[in-house]
Amino acid sequence: MKRGVLLVGHGSHLSANSSAPVYQHARTLRERGTFDEVRTGFWKEEPPLSRALESCDADDITVVPIFISSGYFTDEVVPREMGLTGRVTHVRGKTVRYTPPVGAHPALARVVVHRAEEAGAAPGDALAVLGHGTPRNPRSEQNVYAQAKAVAAIGRFAEVTTVFLDQEPNMRDVFSLVSAETVVMVPLFIADGWHVGETIPEDMALDGPETRRGGRRLRYAAAVGTDNSIADVIEELVREASAW
């Protein structure tokens, strides 16, 4: 029996950065050779979700959403477009397993810590997990808080807090939420796209990877979704789904 993995993402007709992490992690998984086949599919790019399974030769396929949290796309769009009816669907003689998104897995906390350390975080620093936030999807907020709690449980940093782009507590107030002299802010986003690369730095008036304000320092990390160790999270999701 051939085992395959299908990574699905949103994609964009306007920005290649949107799909770049999906392709990146697919390449990593292929190089590792853990699975017989690794494919990709998108909502806004080719190959489309509606035809993604057609490209798979494997008999047992695990579909992994490259999204930060569960919501409209993972709960409705992906299953509808791919004809999935639950965690396990049998389609044209194939067994298709559908996992939760990578961003909701507990192992993502290790990726957040890694991103912070890459940005120069030290044990005495504060870490701020930065989420998008949206009133349309309360699970988005809940997932950010859950990841921050998991990061705090690792015990690597003096303080761990949560901030958002589009809701309270707002990222602009990050210094008032912690007492540490240095704060490392890690974006809980999949891609280094428009928000991570433009709107957040502009709204925060960041000077670059490091910004100094009133004797304090803010370090801005790269998005968690582009970290190479996301491939480890994907493998863990596939391993868990194989027991279904």
Regions from the language model: what does each represent?
Residues M1-W244:
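Active-site-proximal alpha-helix that buttresses catalytic centers in soluble enzyme cores
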